[in-house]
């Protein structure tokens, strides 16, 4: 991803719950309010949710944190029985069509789904927010700060579609990818 887009991704799209590990999770629980879907992106965030008996509908992990291997405790802790397991390749700094397809399939599934990303899941929150039903919640970690809680609304989806297009325009095979992604985002 080009450096010019990085500041756009640093903008908070939700509410930051500060704290380390389970402290951040404990503070956000009161604001979950029965979401349509609960989606967790990131190993440490997911670990602390599961450790607090908060079970996401979808979790997206890559066995890494801050671009380094996650601890064995975190890796093991995100492998929760009862989840269908899907593995997808997604290189760092991009959003692949395969990742989008897997997230889309998980959102319409009636099963809990663990998406294991070989590569990097850092950008997975963006398509998750765009494809999730309204009133869903997407949680992702802000390293050394806490957990971001994003409630999915029409206005947020509209705002993020422009950013999403800018990211995809910088990738190879952009025309076909943009066409397929827009189709998915519109429910086809």
Swiss-Prot record:
Q: Which InterPro entries match?
A: GTP-dep_dephospho-CoA_kin
Task: Enumerate the residues binding GTP.
Answer: 43-44, 62, 121, 144
The domain of life is Archaea
Enzymatic reactions: 3'-dephospho-CoA + GTP = GDP + CoA + H(+)
Q: Which Pfam families match?
A: DUF359 (PF04019)
Sorted alphabetically, the keyword list is:
Coenzyme A biosynthesis, GTP-binding, Kinase, Nucleotide-binding, Transferase
What start and end residues bound the annotated signal peptide?
A: none
Q: Which GO terms describe its biological process?
A: coenzyme A biosynthetic process
According to the UniProt entry, its GO molecular function terms are: GTP binding; kinase activity
Its pathway is: Cofactor biosynthesis; coenzyme A biosynthesis
Q: What class of enzyme is it?
A: transferase
> EC number(s) for this protein?
2.7.1.237
Q: Describe its function.
A: Catalyzes the GTP-dependent phosphorylation of the 3'-hydroxyl group of dephosphocoenzyme A to form coenzyme A (CoA).
Protein family per UniProt: Belongs to the GTP-dependent DPCK family.
Identification of the protein by name: GTP-dependent dephospho-CoA kinase
Q: Which organism is it from?
A: Methanococcoides burtonii (strain DSM 6242 / NBRC 107633 / OCM 468 / ACE-M)
């Amino acid at each position: 991803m080009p450096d010019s887009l990085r500041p756009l991704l640093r903008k908070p799209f939700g509410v930051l719950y500060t704290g380390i590990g389970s402290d951040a999770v404990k503070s956000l629980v009161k604001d979950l309010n029965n979401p349509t879907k609960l989606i967790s992106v990131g190993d440490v965030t997911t670990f602390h949710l599961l450790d607090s008996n908060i079970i996401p509908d979808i979790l997206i992990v890559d066995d890494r944190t801050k671009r380094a291997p996650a601890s064995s405790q975190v890796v093991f802790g995100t492998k929760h029985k009862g989840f269908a397991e899907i593995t997808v390749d997604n290189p760092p700094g991009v959003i692949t069509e395969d990742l989008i397809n897997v997230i889309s399939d998980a959102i319409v599934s009636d099963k809990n789904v663990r998406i294991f990303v070989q590569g990097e899941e850092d950008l997975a929150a963006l398509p998750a927010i765009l494809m999730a039903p309204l009133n869903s919640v997407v949680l992702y970690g802000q390293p050394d700060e806490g957990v971001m809680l994003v409630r999915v609304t029409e206005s947020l989806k509209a705002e993020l579609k422009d950013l999403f297009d800018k990211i995809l325009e910088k990738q190879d095979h952009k025309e076909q990818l943009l066409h397929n992604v827009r189709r998915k985002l519109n429910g086809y």
